Amino acid sequence: MHDHSGGDPAGAAARMATEIVGLLHDVDPTIDRLAVDRFPYPVIDALRSHGLRLSDADAVFLPARAVKLPIELPYLCEAMTRVDGAVARLEQAIAPGRTEAQVWSEYYGDLIATEGQYVCTRLFQSGPRTFPYFQECSERVLQAGDLVCLDTDACGFEGYSVDFSRTFLCGDGPPTATQRTLYGRAREQLEHNAALLRPGIEFRELAGQAWPVPDEHRDSRYYCVGHGLGLAGEFPNIPHAIEGVPYPLPGVVEPGMVICLESYVGSRTAGEGVKLEDQFLITADGVERMSTYGFDDRLGGS
């Protein structure tokens, strides 16, 4: 508002509010409530000065966006195709002696080269930086034997997002026993929870039956069981069930939803962790796994 007001933000806000109120009254002069997605504060103040009651539009938009229309599905599939290619480029670039940033740039560069749009985060870590999770890529130099974690978090095509995660092993050597254990548990969590997904299952039921995270990994587990996806990470964000605490999120998994199931299994003792995640489309009679990128065979993938 300040950047584009010609030096008069209050006046610009007043004019914008007057125009909005006029459009509302053209529909129905009795309208006195407006759901707002995002407005500059001066416009919010100006709208309220007209007597409008403002509310958060997310309550309307997010449930509506959660269920995809058939016309949206080809866009989601095309986005996945472009991101898959970029992940393959990154996996090929993983090698001792390269920095995390150098390897991650191969992922971003390939996405752009195929006219993908952008990556929303820099969640790419190696070695001791894989624990705890949510560390951005850095200038750390990859070493042989490192675990290397990627979360795609990409806007792949025409505004539609792709969100899956893979963990790779750097170098040509075998993994350690601890690395195989962490990977095996992360894969078990992912597949266990994937088997629960179905149209009609309540969020509460999904969380309650989710893979029981062992005590040694509980403090560093991923913050939710899974979440919706579309134009970004979206509703529903499915929290873990906590014994003795009423489950906070009502609702059910519906056909047309895209759900990303999360897994992170880390070890404070070993100082490393494994991040896996897959993206699923809920259909009328089942579930389709949208992310089919392979798992690292050396760590126990297939």
Show the residue positions of the predicted features.
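Active-site neighborhoods and metal-handling regions in enzymes and metal-associated proteins
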Residues: 1-302
